[in-house]
Amino acid sequence: MRCRLTLPLLLSLILSAIPAAALDVLYLVRHAEKVDDWPAAREMDAYRPLSPAGVARAESLAARLKGEGIAAVYSSRTTRSLATAEPLAKATGKPIVGDDATTRPEEMAGFLASLREKYAGDRAVLIVGHSNTIPELLVKLGAKPECFQRLGITGQPGSLLTDGYDGLWRVDLKKQGCEAIERDTLKPNP
């Protein structure tokens, strides 16, 4: 009788000591270069496509991340962001998930928490955003003013930006603060 009670107790202690599986990494990237000469720039900006350089950079992103265990590809709903995500989605066989929370600072914390929960046990998720939303996401993920320069973030809280189209941010979700975030350069394919 004593053995029957001890074995389940022992098993539960062992299992509780094993850490729960968690999502390992978030990759963040600004959409690739968009066409400059868009006729309806203001009213139809959300539909502005990628330039040839942007298409090359999107293909470079796919080549760079296709072996990284991408479990999901999230994007804002603009044409340029979706087109940036498309080559990686095709390479990994993952659909693109358009989510407005990628562009709404007030929804970002909940969005990031839901990704951690939904993809617990997976290796990585990509988020494609914009020059003004990538910094907001990075702040929600632990970026502090002391690492803004290293991460390519400019401006003041409330109006942070990233410059250029070549940034690829890798956030190690097992770490915290600035040490969790690395910025790499993403060159377009020739």
Give residue ranges: language-model regions.
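Positively charged n-region of N-terminal signal peptides that target proteins for export
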Residues: M1-L5
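Residue-level preference for the first positions of well-ordered beta-strands
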Residues: L26, D122-V128
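Bacterial N-terminal signal peptides
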Residues: T6-A17
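Long, charged/polar, surface-exposed segments that mediate recognition or autoinhibition
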Residues: S131
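Sec/Tat signal peptide C-region and signal peptidase I cleavage site
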Residues: I18-A22
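Active-site-proximal alpha-helix that buttresses catalytic centers in soluble enzyme cores
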Residues: L23-Y119, I134-P190
